[in-house]
Regions:
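N-terminal glycine-rich, Lys/His-bearing helix-loop that initiates the first secondary-structure elements
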Residues: 1-53
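Conserved PLP-enzyme active-site core in the AAT-like
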Residues: 2-5, 13-22, 82-301
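Glycine-rich beta-alpha junction loops
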Residues: 18-20, 33-39, 209, 226-228, ...
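Conserved N-terminal alpha-helix of the aminotransferase class I/II PLP-enzyme fold
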Residues: 36, 41-93, 115-122
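PLP-dependent enzyme catalytic core of the Aspartate aminotransferase-like
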Residues: 80, 131, 147-150, 340, ...
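Conserved small-domain helix->loop->beta segment predominantly found in fold-type I
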Residues: 261-263, 285-286, 291-360, 376-382
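Short, well-ordered beta-strand elements within core beta-sheets of diverse protein domains
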Residues: 272-282, 329-337, 392-396
Length: 413
């Protein structure tokens, strides 16, 4: 596997661990549960702490099992390095903790996962201004920029309404202005899309979703694509400038976010996520094809008011999705027409499960306005296009016909 040949996506993931010798010939990287790491020579321990030699210091800052997962993700995203965190939200929080100051300004897409939106609102309330814009048009992002803008944050496919940011043109704008461009790749995954191709500086993945894919482990990651020039970023502390400039951002993230705030990914979760990632392409192909079939069927039903799925030709950003993504993913949402109660509908489903997660092998559904967006209130929900009857669907890997029949019978009952 080290002869320089470029392999396919799944082959690369499956054999990623073999880039280095694995203990005792194990085919999977073992789970290392140690919190501390001993050295026979105390000077070597000091060298590791001072960054003069590679090695592990304490479980909060690094672990061999987590490192193996980080290296897999780096290869998936074709980046230069990756840091893993306890959750996807911890990874987003790390951006604030390690790379931003209260005098900075952030431009964020207005179309975000509910908890991400809440986090950026909290940041704004604490004194770091955040501008929320319609990121489907780069002009809105450009108008929001200020001399103090340090970061632009977008999701590839917005959860739950599936709006798609003007990814390539925002990337070009950030590159021209020297602004950190953070792209949340969770809804597309590294299999469907590589944000590096549109100029992303950092790529965020909620590993719980498509990468892990089985709903049995939490995790998040940030990948440095190698495209951003950290030597011009004003928020790097002098202590991290002893490394090569290309390493400054991740060195500061590891220390200021992982070490100081403690959002470390545990080795057991890392192992689950790494094993889950091996079937990512197979799962996403199935989820994408079934989601397209379901979206098509729902959009033809007179009892459904609207269907949101990038694979439909009627989707406002269908052309961008078709150009950039390998397929359209397993996330869709739809609204029932007036007179149909979303709770009654969900309760009639026999296969799809009312639950709050995405990217699971099982199909999951949730009444968005009444659960994950309830805290925002009706006015903010309306501004984000969240109707009271909106149902989010995370399509799993069940047999397609079984799912189509399930959603149909719930309408017919």
């Amino acid at each position: 596997m080290n002869d320089g040949k470029k392999f396919g996506f799944t082959t690369t993931i499956l054999h990623s661990d073999r880039q280095k010798p694995i203990e005792h010939g194990s085919l999977h990287k073992p789970i290392h549960t140690a919190v501390a790491y001993g050295y026979r020579d105390a000077r070597e321990l000091a060298d590791v702490f001072q960054g003069k030699k590679p090695g592990y210091r304490y479980g909060r800052q690094g672990n061999p099992t987590v490192t193996a997962l980080e290296e897999k993700i780096t290869r998936m995203e074709e980046g230069v390095s990756t840091l893993c965190f306890a959750t996807g939200m911890a990874a987003i929080g790390a951006l604030v903790q390690a790379l931003l100051r209260t005098s900075d300004h952030v431009v964020s897409s207005a179309f975000l996962f509910g908890n991400t939106n809440s986090l950026w609102q909290t940041v704004d309330l604490q004194g770091m201004p955040v501008s929320f814009v319609d990121a489907t048009d780069v002009a809105n992002v450009e108008r929001a920029l200020k001399p103090t803008t340090r970061m632009v944050f977008v999701e590839t496919i917005a959860n739950p309404r599936t709006q798609i940011a003007d990814l390539a043109r925002i990337g070009a704008l950030c590159r021209e202005r020297g602004i950190l461009y953070v792209v949340d790749n969770t809804m597309t995954s590294p299999y469907l899309f590589r944000p590096k191709d549109v100029g992303a500086s950092l790529v965020l993945n909620a590993l719980t979703k498509s990468i892990g894919g089985h709903g049995n482990a939490l995790g998040g990651s940030l990948t440095d694509t190698g495209l951003f020039d950290w030597s011009h970023y004003p928020n790097i502390a002098e202590s991290y400038k002893r490394f090569a400039p290309a390493q400054w951002g991740m060195a500061q993230l590891r220390a200021k976010a992982l070490r100081d705030f403690g959002g470390a990914l545990g080795p057991e979760a890392a192992h689950h996520l790494a094993v889950g990632s091996e079937t990512m392409a197979l799962r996403i192909e199935r989820e994408s094809s079934t989601a397209l079939a379901l979206a098509t069927k729902l959009s033809a039903d007179a009892r459904v008011a609207a269907v949101y799925y990038p694979g439909l030709p009627t989707h406002p950003q269908h052309a961008i999705a078709k150009q950039l993504f390998r397929a359209y993913g397993g996330l869709l949402s739809f609204e029932l027409k007036e007179g149909f109660d979303c709770f009654d509908y969900l309760n009639r489903l026999k296969i799809a499960i009312p639950a709050s997660n995405l990217g699971d092998t099982r199909t999951l559904v949730i009444p968005v306005a009444h659960t994950i967006y309830h805290e925002m209130g009706p006015a903010r929900r309306a501004s984000m296009g969240i109707a009271e009857s909106l149902i989010r669907v995370s399509v799993g890997i069940e047999d397609t016909d079984d799912l189509l029949d399930d959603f149909a019978q719930a309408l017919n009952a």
